[in-house]
């Protein structure tokens, strides 16, 4: 999913050369997975990748100051709860940086990031419920097939794009499941 997410973002921000990730450090398995996948994808796309770890919300200012010194072009905000559930604390730093940003959840784009691309959480919860019903009905968990997400949500925050002077290509507008005004 990191490849698709970064590929869509690259189409929105074609001049991207240096991407910074804002996320918890030391990170959980989710943050480490996001970081490793982004590092790999950035290398494949020829981008420089920088990680700006935060232990707590009070570290955001320092992380963004470091990113300013490193002259990053854009930000990926981790889906970790530290950042994703505290977007009201993250967005002011993103806005002040005047850099495009993206994250893994629709709610992050709704909060002000330029875009998000993720599996549809509602669909995932529905599938989890169906699995639970099968298990409660007597099915052995080991006998159930592993399913991957099949429904994804691509959101573009048009208001943020305008504020950053980014013209969203018509091809991306056509792909977007949600356009936030």
Features from the language model and the residues they span:
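Short hydrophobic alpha-helices and adjacent helix-cap/hinge residues
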Residues: 1-181
């Amino acid at each position: 999913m990191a490849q698709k997410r970064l590929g869509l973002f690259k189409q929105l921000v074609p001049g991207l050369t240096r991407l910074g990730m804002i996320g918890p450090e030391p990170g959980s398995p989710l943050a480490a997975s996001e970081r490793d996948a982004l590092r790999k994808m950035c290398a494949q796309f020829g981008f420089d990748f920088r990680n700006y770890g935060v232990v707590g919300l009070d570290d955001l200012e320092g992380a963004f100051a470091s990113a300013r010194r490193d002259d990053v072009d854009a930000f990926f905000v981790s889906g970790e709860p530290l950042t994703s559930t505290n977007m009201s604390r993250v967005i002011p730093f993103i806005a002040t940086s005047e850099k495009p940003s993206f994250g893994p959840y629709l709610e992050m784009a709704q909060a002000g990031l330029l875009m998000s691309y993720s599996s549809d959480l509602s669909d995932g919860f529905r599938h989890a419920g169906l699995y639970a019903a099968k298990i409660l009905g007597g099915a052995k968990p080991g006998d159930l097939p592993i399913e991957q997400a099949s429904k994804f949500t691509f959101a573009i925050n048009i208001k943020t794009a305008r504020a950053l002077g980014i013209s969203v290509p018509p091809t991306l507008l056509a792909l977007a499941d949600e356009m936030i005004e």
